[in-house]
Amino acid sequence: MNYFDLPKIDLHCHLDGSVRPQTIIDLADEQNLTLPSRDINVIKEMMVAPETCPNLDEYLKRFELPGMVMQTAEALERISFELFEDAANENVKYLEVRFGPLLHQVKGLSLDDIMDSVVRGMKRAEAQYDIHGNYILSILRTMPKDQIKAVLEAGAKHLNDGIVAFDLAGSEIPGFCHEFVPYAQYAKELGYRITIHAGEQGAGQNVYDAISLLGAERVGHGIFIHNHPEAYQLVKGEEVALETCPSSNVQTKAVNSLSEHPIKAFYKDGIAVTINTDNRTVSNTTMTDEVRKVVEAFELTEAEYFDIYTISVNNAFTSDAVKQHLLSFAQ
């Protein structure tokens, strides 16, 4: 298989974890910000997580530099465009990007400006390249909840025209879903699709709760259903897709090594698995890398790869017309 040429779908990719290091330097110059260094190798080292981190929280420290520069409309539009450009250039045909709008208000940007900027960057890339995309609004579980409704209302102006879904992300504690039930309900009332980060840090119960309490149609990671039979059966029975991110799952210690990743066992048992990058820069990866790692580690055939590709298409938060277009690459 030529992994670069294969059509690819990425349903789980974070904007602030996928910024080009050179762009950090460029934007810092434009914004008169002082970086710890102007050496791109030093900047890259600060943005890329080690191959294995002690835990997820250590991995999340790599988002500090992007957060510093992602505070203007111009920066957000550029970073959005470049991410879709990078994906298109390795034959990613459809990309869903998630980001936390509340993280980009340090300099007073309005929620409307934030949403407009990322969608504008994406649409510019869609016009220039053979790629389609959408945005997912991520709320960090640790942030105050009083702004969540405002985020959802601002995003609703672009609903199904660049923004499609609601997500909860960040450090994961057991039982977090209970306190977010009203917000997930409100998101659904507005017309958002639901995907929730859960089961990345040891709590299979969180996956069960994400589906049963929050109405998750997809789950970010979901690794720890392997030791929670009720969550496992719910995912399987409800055909909830898992957004697995192999390199990231190894880095954050969700699994000890790629060979121990449950993606193939899940797949063979009929669970809807997908292959995704999570954070292209922080995990120093591409979709080409992720596909190669999974295909080679688990000896997948080309037919099995295209089956997983089709699972990704069927679970994408996009229109039937776009899905038909994406399925044409698998024929």
From Swiss-Prot:
Function: Catalyzes the hydrolytic deamination of adenosine and 2-deoxyadenosine.
Record: active site: 200
Organism: Vibrio vulnificus (strain YJ016)
Site feature: Important for catalytic activity: 221
Family membership noted in the UniProt record: Belongs to the metallo-dependent hydrolases superfamily. Adenosine and AMP deaminases family. Adenosine deaminase subfamily.
A UniProt-annotated Pfam family: A_deaminase
EC primary class: hydrolase
Reaction(s) catalysed by this chain's protein: adenosine + H2O + H(+) = inosine + NH4(+); 2'-deoxyadenosine + H2O + H(+) = 2'-deoxyinosine + NH4(+)
A GO cellular component annotation in the UniProt record: cytosol
Name of encoding gene: add
A GO molecular-function annotation: 2'-deoxyadenosine deaminase activity
EC number: 3.5.4.4
Necessary cofactors: Zn(2+)
Keywords: Hydrolase, Metal-binding, Nucleotide metabolism, Zinc
PANTHER family: ADENOSINE DEAMINASE
Keyword Metal-binding found: yes
Keyword Hydrolase: yes
Residues binding Zn(2+), per UniProt: 12, 14, 197, 278
Residues that, per the record, bind substrate: 14, 16, 170
InterPro entries named in the record: A_deaminase (IPR028893), A_deaminase_dom (IPR001365), Ado/ade_deaminase (IPR006330), Metal_Hydrolase (IPR032466)
Protein name: Adenosine deaminase
Cofactor: binding details: Binds 1 zinc ion per subunit.
